[in-house]
UniProtKB/Swiss-Prot annotation:
Transmembrane segments: none annotated. It comes from Bordetella parapertussis (strain 12822 / ATCC BAA-587 / NCTC 13253). The gene is pagP. Belongs to the lipid A palmitoyltransferase family. Induction: The expression of pagP is down-regulated in Bvg-minus phase and up-regulated in Bvg-plus phase. It catalyses: a lipid A + a 1,2-diacyl-sn-glycero-3-phosphocholine = a hepta-acyl lipid A + a 2-acyl-sn-glycero-3-phosphocholine; a lipid IVA + a 1,2-diacyl-sn-glycero-3-phosphocholine = a lipid IVB + a 2-acyl-sn-glycero-3-phosphocholine; a lipid IIA + a 1,2-diacyl-sn-glycero-3-phosphocholine = a lipid IIB + a 2-acyl-sn-glycero-3-phosphocholine. A lipid is attached at C22 (S-diacylglycerol cysteine). One of its GO terms (molecular function) is O-palmitoyltransferase activity. InterPro entries: LipidA_acyl_PagP (IPR009746), OMP/PagP_b-brl (IPR011250). The keyword Plastid does not apply. This is Lipid A acyltransferase PagP.
């Protein structure tokens, strides 16, 4: 449990770091720093709720599937904007129950190209870059990742899905979560 609190403290330290001035950053990183600063200072507030993960039945034995937790309950907070092109960009921090019912913290950045179907309905496709920590991977040492991200939204609510790739007996998980803009 101590390792969990260390990982959570690490993620919480990332949040205030986004508000720092970008002038001292190298020129190649300044644009990213300015965008993160914009999201943090101008973005709306988001509530994230997690709830479901599906393990690809073709990649695991029946016994292993039965041992997994597929109700990935959890939640978190974030900030996001729709940029000058109408694309969504956000920062988030969440914690949820992983496949082994252990708490998995995650914090990151998401980007999606948004297609509007109507005034209130939208579809998105993009990616998320994140840091996470798992008990079964590197003994809770935080590690980075990047995953695809698709969404369908209506007004202030958005449903997201990502697929965690893997090989036979690991990964291959569809993870779904929601976001409420408030």
């Amino acid at each position: 449990m101590t390792q969990y609190f260390r990982a959570l403290a690490f993620f919480l330290l990332l949040v205030p770091a986004t508000a720092m001035a970008c002038d001292d950053w190298p020129s190649w990183a300044r644009g990213a720093c300015q965008r993160v600063d914009q999201i943090w200072n101008e973005g709306g507030n988001d509530l994230y709720l997690t709830g479901y993960s599906w393990h690809n039945r073709a990649m695991y034995s029946s016994d292993k599937i039965r041992s997994f937790n597929e109700l990935a309950w959890g939640g978190g907070l974030g900030k996001s904007i729709y940029d000058e092109d109408g694309d969504w960009q956000g920062l988030y921090a969440m914690a949820f129950l992983d496949s082994h019912s252990d708490i998995e913290p995650i914090a990151g950045y998401g980007f999606q190209k948004i297609g509007r179907i109507g005034a209130d309905t939208r579809l998105g496709i993009g990616y998320t870059v994140f840091l996470t920590s798992r008990s079964d991977i590197m003994s809770r040492v935080p590690f980075p990742g990047i995953l695809p991200l698709v969404s369908a939204g209506y007004r202030d609510a958005t449903l997201y899905a990502t697929y965690i790739p893997g090989g036979k007996g690991n990964g291959n998980v569809l993870f779904m979560f929601g976001r409420w803009e408030f």
